[in-house]
């Protein structure tokens, strides 16, 4: 599962899961995703790991794939979403929630577009998840050109965030399923064994230490300790 904050412990988990799947000659890898996002560097490491495997990959968005979660989902070959799920809103922000520089936005905008394009998704919609200033008159969805009055449900000047139904309409999601078993049924896979890969102790330690709150406390403790030494 790829859940909660995307931190530097998750790339190790994803890479280990992919290596295990390749060793066991698995036919499919499903990533169970529910996240509001996290670190850009961790997300790009995860994206690179997923993109590098020859095994078919599926993102199962179990409620939400926001910010970094969108990039990870788009790196998979297919996307399935539960009813009422969301994907999008991928602008790069700092820990205070303030928008980062145009350089950072430009990088993420094209990273999202390239990732979507590689997976056969619409790169312009992916760009719009990062850049609120983009608008649309035409979209190519599954080879058909659609005339649109911007993205349905999108408020003016806002990042694109798609519900399950809209993600399917615009070709971002491949289907709707309420469980991994339903995903497999949709793919007409009947004879299967599900192997779940969870965090090991080292990945869990990295997740704890790179959690923004814990990192801030460590930094504060280090600063206070330095002050004590100076006074001593």
Regions found by a protein language model. Give the residues of each.
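Soluble extramembrane regions of membrane proteins in the secretory/endomembrane system
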Residues: 1-206
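Juxtamembrane/start-of-transmembrane alpha-helix segments at the extracytoplasmic/lumenal side
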Residues: 207-214
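Conserved small/polar residues in nucleotide/adenosyl-binding loops
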Residues: 221-228
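Cytosolic catalytic cores of cyclic-nucleotide second-messenger enzymes
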Residues: 232
